[in-house]
């Protein structure tokens, strides 16, 4: 599938590489991310007017129940409906709650960083559920700007995008 390009009001350009959301693809990807790569990612909704940039200090507990993935740090947790669930009789609510779109993305031209690499999920209403940011080659591990990009920091994003978005 060809990437989708979106141009933001802030002058950014985002290239989205969608992945299949049927079956357990999204579940498998998120279990891998939160179980194996938790120290490398930043998580939270990123919407106009609000940005939650949460990083993990220790490995979270990752569980599945009735289609919901729970990521639990002990002090706090969140749930994402990533698979079929039966928690409501309403077919419409089941459709709305479940991930309806998942896409790896690269955004260029922002005011905070020359580029950002991530994964974004939307529900059946088209509302953002979560954004997961991957290591950025323009910054060190303490978010200090590097003089020269370290392109190897995009390997996790590139590898997962290649496996899950098939390109």
Regions inferred by a protein language model and the residue ranges of each:
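Eukaryotic intrinsically disordered, low-complexity regulatory linkers and tails enriched in Ser/Thr/Pro
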Residues: 1-167
């Amino acid at each position: 599938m060809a990437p989708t390009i979106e141009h933001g009001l802030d002058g950014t350009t985002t290239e989205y590489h969608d992945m299949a959301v049927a079956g357990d693809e999204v579940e498998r990807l998120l279990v891998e991310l939160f179980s194996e790569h938790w120290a490398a990612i930043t998580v939270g909704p990123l919407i106009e007017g609000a940005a939650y940039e949460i990083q993990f200090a220790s490995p979270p507990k990752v569980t599945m129940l009735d289609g919901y993935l729970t990521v639990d740090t002990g002090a706090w947790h969140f749930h994402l409906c990533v698979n079929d669930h039966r928690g409501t009789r309403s077919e419409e609510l089941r459709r709305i709650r479940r991930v309806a779109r998942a896409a790896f993305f690269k955004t260029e031209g922002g005011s905070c960083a020359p580029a950002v690499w991530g994964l974004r999920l939307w529900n059946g209403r088209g509302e953002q559920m979560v954004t997961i940011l991957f290591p950025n080659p323009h910054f060190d591990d303490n978010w200090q700007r590097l003089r020269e990009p370290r392109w190897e920091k995009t390997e996790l994003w590139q590898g997962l995008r290649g496996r899950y978005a098939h390109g």
